[in-house]
Structures are given as C-alpha cells and as structure tokens.
Amino acid sequence: MAKGEGAEQYTNTSLLQKPSPDEVKLAKHETKSRLSVCSKLCYAIGGAPYQITGCAIGFFLQIYLLDVALLDPFYASIILFVGRAWDAVTDPTVGFLVSRTPWTRFGRMMPWIVLSTPFAVLCYFLIWYVPSVDQGKVVWYLIFYCCFQTLQTCFHVPYSALTMFISTEQKERDSATAYRMTVEVLGTLIGTAIQGQIVGMANAPCISTEIDLNSTGLEVAPDVNITDPHVSLQDLRNAYMIASGVICAIYVVCAVVLFLGVKEQKDTCRVRTEPMSFFQGICMVMGHGPYAKLVMGFLFTSLAFMLLEGNFALFCIYNLGFRNDFQNVLLVIMLSATLAIPFWQWFLTKFGKKTAVYIGTTSVVPFLISVVLVPSSLAVTYIASFAAGVSVAAAFLLPWSMLPDVVDDFKVQNPESQGHEAIFYSFYVFFTKFASGVSLGVSTLSLDFAGYVTRGCTQPGEVKLTLKILVSAAPIVLIIIGLLIFISYPINEEKRQGNRKLLNEQRENEMDSETDSTELNVV
C-alpha cells in the first residue's frame, strides 16, 4: 500500500458520514463559548489591582507600621489582625449581596467593580499617609485599612465570580484563568517593584542601641548618623506616598480595561433559584464535600505562604543582613513566579491539577530550609529566591483553577440550585483572608513578645529565632497539613471531564426546551 493511501480512503469515507445531532450541538456550543485573546487579556488585567495592592500591603505594611509610622508592635498587630479579620467577614457578606443582585444591562458583577473602584483608591492612598497627631494613628490606620479592605472586596468577589460568566466552557475558563494568573503574578511583580524600588531609594538610617555592641564594646555600625533621623524618615514617608499614588493610578486603569473589554454572559443553563439567607449560604457551600476539602487544604497552604510573605522582608534585613537588598530579593521571587505560570498551566493540563498541587506546593520546602541553614550569602539567597518563586506561581494559579471545578460539581449534584457562584468564591476568599489576618497578627505579636526594637540596626537573638520559625518551620508544618487534606479531595481529571459532559447536556436540554416553548408560543 502506498504511503498515505489508507489515510486518504479513510478521510473520504469520513467526509461522507453526517455528524450526529449531539456533535453538531456541541460544536455550535463550543464555538459560541470561545473567548478571544483580547477578551482573555482584558479579563486578566482586571485581576492586577488586587494583587498589586495585596503584594504591597503583604510585604511592606508590617514594616511600614513598625519602622515608618513608628507604632508599637502590639498596636501594629491589632491593626493587621483586625483589618484582615474585617476583610474576611466582608467577603461572604459581599458574596451574599452579589448573589442577590439583579441582572443589569452591564451584567450582575460589573456594577460592583466599577462603583467600588474610586473609593477603594482613595482609602488605599490614605493607608500610606502618616497623620501628624500621634494619638490618632492607630484609629487612622484601622479606619482606612478596614474601609479599603471592604471596598476592595466589593471589587474582587464579583471579579472572582466573573470567571463563571465569561464562558460556559471549562477549557475556556481554564485558559482565561491562566491568563489571569499570569497577569496577577505580574501584578505582584509590579507591586513589589514599585513599592520596593521607590521606597528603597529613600532608606532612613537605623538607630543604634545597646544590642549593637560587639564583644569589644564598639558599635557594629558606627557610621550611622542619627543626629537628625527625622529628615530621612520624612523622605521615607514621602516615598511610600509616591508609591501608593502610582499604584492607585494603575488600579483605575485596570478597572477601566476590564469594564470595556469583557462582556458578562448570562448563564442559560437554568433559571436562578430563589435567593437564600446568609446562613443558608454558609450551610450550602460548606456542606458540599469537595468544596470543603479544597478550601481547607488551600487554607493551610495559603497560610504558609502568607507567613512567608509577611515576615520575609524583616528576615532579610535582620537575619540575613540585607537591609539595602531585601526589596531586590522580593523582586526576584515575583519575577520567577511570573515566568513560571505558563509552566504550571502546561503541567496541570498534562498531569492533572491534583498532581500539580503536590509538586508545586512541596517545591518551596527546600528554599525554606536553605535560607535558614545556609550561611548568609546574597548570591545563594537570590538563587533560592528564584527557585521559591516557581512554587509561589503554583500557589497563585491552582486555587483559582480548581474552584470552577468544584462549582461545576455542585451544579451537577444540585441541578435545581443555581446562581450561587459568588457565594462559593466569597467564602474561599473569606477563609484565606482570615488566615492572612491570623498570620500577620500572630507574627507581629510574636515579634513584640520577643522584644522587637523599632528601627533597630540589629535585633535580639529571640527576635531572630522567631523570624526563623515564621519563615521556615511554621510554613513547612502548614504545607504538610494542607497536603494531607488534599489526599481526600475527590475531583480528579476523570471526574472533572464527566462533570463537563453532564453540564453540557444540561445546557443543551435547557436550550432545546426554550426553543420548543418559543415555537409553541408562535403556533
């Protein structure tokens, strides 16, 4: 037989066969649900503000409150914990309100995103302003931190739930999620670069104390000039305000691009059920086994990365001695994470999302061990930071890639209960933000108990030991707990594809029913 002869015969035979009605419907459905690259990019850009501001707050707010606003560590821990706890409470509340929002000409999610943006930008800017009245600093930061978190929640919860309304196809949603995660990690890179580099150019000198004496009684840092530290401190405060102004401008631009470039699609699968109460929503989402296991697993792994994020700047300054380089180390982590997102998207497509969780999360452990055990070396720290960024990328991508699978599983098991996507997303954000509040509050309070010295050139041994625990031992334990929970997570690739097929059948049946009803009304 000549080469290609059999293939030609097979092709001719295939062309004579008519596709089945189901194949025709599926092809039309997939074509209609396909997203353009432009739409995916505009959708992805909308996720940047949350990550840019979150990265700036996560990496720099703790050190800002301690060494720039000059707050006592105890009050700083209260601000960080109350702000994140309040933020966590607002997530399910906003999710509940979004789920009851009627459909408008702009959709159900877009009005929340647009209206919250200008007020969120104002509150974010005021977080990085130091009021002149010392007695009112704590109240100032509490008010504007909580207000910003509330307004950002009004942006982020609808934006997260928008994933379910940009397309009905899992493949398209996963692709859009990959675009989004790439831009969001790029957003953390931008946030780290803007905040770190602008602030890094205006470093205020540290203050020598009695613990800065070596065994001979001489100061370790005798060249530090503290005759008038207020001048340099004011420059540092101005640098924080400049950085916040730049971030506010980016926030507004991203919101405009999202609004103009993304069209929210109305789900045609089923008519939405009657709105449920807030506590009914809690029972509904937590009563769905796959969702509860997914959230609990990522709760512990996210807490590990949040502990690392919140304390790594202090660890670089006081344990590793990189006071003038810590912002560059953070930048390397975020740059590596940005570059690794396409790899993890390919990996989860090739080997499955559950496998990606195990490989991606555990890859950070060697970094956590090396930064504590290996003697301080800037070159080694850069290499380890680049390797850690690969794991950070997985931590960004996987939760948002797996949440739509859980929502789809709920729809398959509860076909009569629809329109609750925002509740699922908001409760996930609630748990992760609550974990973030706990991590920041506990870590800052631990530093207070250990004897943290505000703007000190060095710190007591107890503080350095506490920082080692917060960036190494504690995250490793939390990662292990999270991975043990993921063992019982039931949605594998086979289950996911089965749910996809069932949902497509539901949508096709619903569209057929609507078509039949229309024809009967015409007759």
From Swiss-Prot:
Residues 504-523 are annotated as: Disordered. Its main location: membrane. Pfam families: MFS_2. GO terms for biological process: carbohydrate transport; establishment of blood-brain barrier; fatty acid transport; lipid transport across blood-brain barrier; lysophospholipid translocation; lysophospholipid transport; transcytosis; transmembrane transport. The keyword DNA repair does not apply. One of its GO terms (cellular component) is endoplasmic reticulum membrane. It catalyses: a 1-acyl-sn-glycero-3-phosphocholine(in) + Na(+)(in) = a 1-acyl-sn-glycero-3-phosphocholine(out) + Na(+)(out); 1-(4Z,7Z,10Z,13Z,16Z,19Z-docosahexaenoyl)-sn-glycero-3-phosphocholine(in) + Na(+)(in) = 1-(4Z,7Z,10Z,13Z,16Z,19Z-docosahexaenoyl)-sn-glycero-3-phosphocholine(out) + Na(+)(out); 1-(9Z-octadecenoyl)-sn-glycero-3-phosphocholine(in) + Na(+)(in) = 1-(9Z-octadecenoyl)-sn-glycero-3-phosphocholine(out) + Na(+)(out); 1-hexadecanoyl-sn-glycero-3-phosphocholine(in) + Na(+)(in) = 1-hexadecanoyl-sn-glycero-3-phosphocholine(out) + Na(+)(out). The chain crosses the membrane at residues 35-64, 76-96, 109-128, 139-163, 171-202, 227-260, 291-317, 329-347, 352-373, 377-413, 424-450, 463-486. Residues 1-34, 97-108, 164-170, 261-290, 348-351, 414-423, 487-523 are cytoplasmic. Disruption phenotype: Morpholino knockdown of the gene results in early postnatal lethality. Disulfide bonds join C206-C457. Glycans are attached at N214, N225. InterPro entries: MFS_2 (IPR039672), MFS_trans_sf (IPR036259). The keyword Transport applies. It is found in: Cell membrane; Endoplasmic reticulum membrane. It comes from the Eukaryota. Gene3D superfamilies: MFS general substrate transporter like domains. Residues 65-75, 129-138, 203-226, 318-328, 374-376, 451-462 are extracellular. Belongs to the major facilitator superfamily. PANTHER family: MAJOR FACILITATOR SUPERFAMILY DOMAIN-CONTAINING PROTEIN (PTHR11328), SODIUM-DEPENDENT LYSOPHOSPHATIDYLCHOLINE SYMPORTER 1 (PTHR11328:SF29). Sodium-dependent lysophosphatidylcholine (LPC) symporter, which plays an essential role for blood-brain barrier formation and function. Specifically expressed in endothelium of the blood-brain barrier of micro-vessels and transports LPC into the brain. Transport of LPC is essential because it constitutes the major mechanism by which docosahexaenoic acid (DHA), an omega-3 fatty acid that is essential for normal brain growth and cognitive function, enters the brain. Transports LPC carrying long-chain fatty acids such LPC oleate and LPC palmitate with a minimum acyl chain length of 14 carbons. This is Sodium-dependent lysophosphatidylcholine symporter 1-B. It comes from Danio rerio (Zebrafish).
